Amino acid sequence: MLVDRYGNTFQSLTNVEKNTGETFIDGKPIYIKTLRFDERGSSLNSWHKLSDLGLSNVNDIWIDESNSFVHIETSSYSGFQSVNTYTASNNYKRATISVADGLNLNSQDGNDINMAWIITIKYTKTTD
């Protein structure tokens, strides 16, 4: 079993909902799920309802930025960026999530690019 420097077991990233074994400040269990979105273009404003992501009864939700990234591929570059990267006002990648609005993937780039968004979300449920 692999553990981090604090003795916590590593969570594998999967698109199947898993209970992390952690609890939120209100004592509710925290769940985790990793999603992938393949997008192409020089700008993006993509909205995804929580129900479309297979989520229901969500109470609190946030993006686990330590396990989320965007893989960028252009004709001259291939690499990874944080999901919230601001290089300039016309070059950024941003992911936000809320119970009311769902997941928003938003980007602007001067190039026509392929983007693979890997977004790991953590959340609690109203039913717990």
Model-derived features with residue positions:
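Short linear motifs at secondary-structure transitions and domain/linker junctions
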Residues: 7-10, 70-74, 90-96
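Surface-exposed interaction regions enriched in Ser/Thr/Asp/Glu
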Residues: 81-128
